[in-house]
A protein has these predicted regions:
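Acidic, metal-coordinating catalytic cores used for nucleic-acid/nucleotide bond scission
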Residues: 59-67
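Long, low-complexity, Lys/Arg-enriched
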Residues: 1-56, 68-115
Length: 115
């Protein structure tokens, strides 16, 4: 089975990004951590289809939103799902890849995250 790839921006309208989807259309209060987490969980549940998905997340700042996405991924991901981060490099005018997480199970079926 081929892994589905979703290019995802953190917040719509903040930057011009090479993405099809955004986790958040808007953020009313960047310090409302519960709302951020619920919004990110909603995003992952809407895009999960029990197939392996690689989420390429383009980070645009807003650390609380990024942390909420990581937490939501850890709560909703299916086995084989991946979360990879892309950060903008001003000098190169391109995005730099940072490997994140792959969800899997060990031989005793214990849930694990591989970095």
């Amino acid at each position: 089975m081929k892994m589905k790839v979703l290019n995802v921006g953190l917040v719509k309208g903040r930057h011009n990004l090479p993405v099809e989807f955004y986790v958040y259309n808007e953020i009313k209060d960047v310090l409302d951590f519960d709302a951020l987490l619920l919004g990110a969980i909603k995003f992952f549940k809407e895009h999960s289809n029990n197939n392996q998905i690689e989420y390429n997340l383009y980070i645009t700042g807003l650390t609380p939103a990024t942390i909420a996405v990581i937490r939501a991924f850890s709560l909703t991901a299916n086995e084989g799902d991946r979360l990879t981060f892309y950060h903008y490099d001003r000098e190169a005018d391109s995005f730099k890849k940072q490997y994140g997480f792959v969800v899997g199970f060990d031989s005793k079926f214990n849930f694990t995250y591989l970095i």
